[in-house]
Amino acid sequence: MIELTGEQTVDFLYRCYSAVDGLWCMKVEEKYGFDVALDIDNEVWKVFPKIQARKLKELTGLGNGIEALYECLTTKMRLEGYSFEAERVGNDGAFRITIDDCSWHNIMVSSGRKRLSSRVGNKICATEFSVWASEFGKDIQVEQECRICEGSETCVLKFSP
């Protein structure tokens, strides 16, 4: 058996995770069309962020609230290789995440599917991040201020209590 370093293991698992996310969706699209595949993908993203958030809460001992969301979500984004900055906004715990390189959009572009990227981003990103927010408090709101897939230089997400 080959012994991989921790970094190699993470890289391997992340590559597999990324590939299966796109692969199953493409296979559903081949059989049922893009709209059905996008709807099913959206259903998956109504559940998957709950699993991620709950696991990070368990690993860190964090509970609910905007501060715990900030810590867990920025950790998740770092682990997934996002290029982003997070900043506090105001005194109520609100924060903004600015993503300057979106790997999912890049995959859509490199596979010749840029024209579909905004449809995916509009539906899936809205679902993913709102589910993340709800896992830390039912009153936490998320607003997508702009998105790369719609021609902006960055994606900007604002989370507020």
Residue ranges of each PLM-predicted region?
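N-terminal accessory segment detector
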Residues: 1-123, 134-154, 158-161
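Mixed-charge, glycine-accented linear interaction segment located at domain edges/termini
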Residues: 127-129
